[in-house]
Each structure stands twice: as C-alpha cells, then as structure tokens.
Amino acid sequence: MPKKSIWLPGAPATPLRIPNAVKAGPWVFASGTMGGPVGGGLAPEVRGHPGLPLAGEAKGIREARYILETIEAAFKAAGTSVASGVWLNQFVTGRQHVDPYHEVRRDFVKPPRPASTTVAQPSLLAPGATVQVDMVAIDPALAPAPIVLAMAKHPLVEKYDL
C-alpha cells in the first residue's frame, strides 16, 4: 500500500522535517503536534499578545485550539477529519494542562470518541509547549466495507437469542 506525506502550506519548518501527517491506504496518521515547531518555541497564535499576556483566552485554550486546528487541516488535506479519528494520544507536562485541553477537544472530537491515552511527562520538544497530540483517523471514502458475519445458524445465536 503506497503512503503519502501530508505537508501543510505555511507550516513552520522544523529541523526534523516531519510531515504533518502520513496517509497509507484508508489510514491517516497525524504526527505529534504541539503549540509550535520542535525547537522553535510557541506559535504566535499560542503565545498571544506580548504586551497583554492575560488578554483573551487562556494560553492552554489557545494551545489546544492551535493543535487541533493543525491536525484537522492535515486530515482535511488527506481526505478525512478529526471526526473520523480512531486513536488519540495526548502528552501533557502537568495535570493542570488537561482540563483546558479537554475543554477544546470536546469542540473537535464528538462521540463516538476515538480510543485515547493521556501521558504526563516533564517537558516537550517545543519550548513552552505543554500539550502534544497525535491521532489516527480513517478516510471514510476508502474504508473497507463492514464485515457481516453469517451467524444465523450459529449455535450461540440460538442459545443466547443473539
């Protein structure tokens, strides 16, 4: 199965040159996404106004929105969306960053939600970043047809009235 790298136009270059996502068949894998590029600090949208650090939304909200909008843009470029996510990993630098992230995540990720894991770790590679997210989604247009099991004559169907 061929794979295709997804690069968002205007995305900040990183020393590692990792694509925003990779599509392989019906699957799309978003790279770990933070509030700024590896080694480059936080994106202006996350930092906020330098003279008014407390103006507007809290940094955690801005950071989560930037991350999920970036993943959504990469998925859209690959023919899917966060709504088709099946696996979601979150890495946080402290418990205090979980609630702001989840507040924004609820706006992007609706039920049925993907399988999910949250990991706490002391720091991330983008200076000042407090959350990193990677996600796997399926392209519904390329998803395999559902498997229908012919169970009508299976003994368990009769025994348990399945």
Set out the residue ranges of the language-model regions.
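N-terminal presequence-like segments and the immediate start of the first folded domain
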Residues: 1-69, 73-87, 92-162
